[in-house]
Amino acid sequence: PAYNVPEEGRVVVNITVNPAGVVIGTSINPQTNTVNSTLRKAAEDAAKKARFNTVEGPNNQTGTITYYFNLR
C-alpha cells in the first residue's frame, strides 16, 4: 500500500470475507508491530480493496493479511 511517512513496520489485518469474495470487515491484529496510525490505516484500506475467489455456501470466511512497510 502507498504511504507517506518515514517509518517501517508490519501490520497484520484481520479480515472477514463474504461468500462473494468481498472483504466485509477488518481490524488490526495484535501481532502488528507498529503504533503508527498512517501505516495501520493504509493496511486496512488495502485489505478492504482485496478480492477473493467466491465460495459455495452462506458462511463468511476469516483470515489475516500481513503488510510489510519498508523504507527504500
For the regions a protein language model found, what residue spans apply to each?
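A short, well-structured alpha-helical segment
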Residues: 6-7, 12, 22-60
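Short, low-complexity, Pro/Ser/Thr/Gly-rich segments in the mature regions of secreted, periplasmic
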Residues: 64-71
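Short, basic/aromatic recognition patches
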Residues: 1-4
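Short, ordered coil/turn segments that flank beta-strands lining enzyme active or ligand-binding pockets
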Residues: 19
